[in-house]
Amino acid sequence: MSELTEEQIAEFKDAFVQFDKEGTGKIATRELGTLMRTLGQNPTEAELQDLIAEAENNNNGQLNFTEFCGIMAKQMRETDTEEEMREAFKIFDRDGDGFISPAELRFVMINLGEKVTDEEIDEMIREADFDGDGMINYEEFVWMISQK
């Protein structure tokens, strides 16, 4: 829990206690999604199942506060990473159409001080262009960045 601030832990505790109606120090795993949403997180059902499987130590359908804080820390890290990826994508997607064209990629690379040929730009696009449209969409961009 060292990556969480004291304020975050206190906020999580307040919310956790509201869901711990019997005062056992535990919540039912089925309540996790609702609890997380009250704290501004919006995990998908699949993400919830993965988070529960990772955090639940004794597989009894309940989470204690420490397990819950671990889940929240992980979810917040992933949310931060997602936001950073979207911001990076926007830098490349200069016209905001949701795609990085060869011209946009070339512009950014040159502004970063990279000397790249048209062939190198085309190769970079080809490596990540899974749908074959000649441009890089957000999902392809994330894949490309995660390969580096």
Swiss-Prot record:
Gene3D superfamilies: EF-hand
Sample GO molecular function, one term: myosin VI head/neck binding
CDD domains: EFh
SMART domains: EFh
UniProt keywords, alphabetically: Calcium, Metal-binding, Repeat
Cellular-component GO terms for this entry: cytoplasm; investment cone; myosin VI complex; nucleus
Transmembrane residue ranges: none
The EF-hand domain, residue ranges: 7-42, 43-78, 80-115, 116-148
Residues binding Ca(2+) 2: 58, 60, 62, 67
Binding, Ca(2+) 3: 93, 95, 97, 104
Entry binding sites for Ca(2+) 1: 20, 24, 26, 31
Residues reported in the UniProt entry to bind Ca(2+) 4: 129, 131, 133, 135, 140
InterPro entries: CALM/Myosin/TropC-like, EF-hand-dom_pair, EF_Hand_1_Ca_BS, EF_hand_dom
Family indicated by similarity: Belongs to the calmodulin family.
Function: May be involved in calcium-mediated signal transduction.
Protein name per the record: Calmodulin-related protein 97A
Taxonomic lineage of the native organism: Eukaryota, Metazoa, Ecdysozoa, Arthropoda, Hexapoda
